[in-house]
Amino acid sequence: VPAPAELPALADEEIIERISAVHGIGRWTVEMLLMFQLGRRDVLPVDDFGVCNGFRLAYGLRGMPRPKALAKYAERWAPERTLAAWYLWRAVDLHRAGKLPARRGKPPRVAQLKKKTKSAPQAQRR
């Protein structure tokens, strides 16, 4: 585990790898440390429910995005993915308050981001 004084000099992924090696500390926890304690600007916690839900709401998707596909889509937001996370969390807040504007037109090509859901057998669909 790196000493606190070492952290500013380390890359985000190196910090994630080294700290999440500690039993009980996962990637999400380290990403929150990077964002809120170290002020890193290019972190998008794609496993965060709020980030995924905000993306679903903002882009008018029916299903939740898969984390890997969301990470790929979010490459265009670098080097400001932390800011994107904040806006995605805010989209959830606005939706709950009834203030998220409805999307007009087709959503961008993000269909591949939806999680696959098991469809019911034909006999049960009636």
Task: Outline where the language-model segments fall.
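Catalytic cores of DNA base-excision repair glycosylases
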Residues: V1-R126
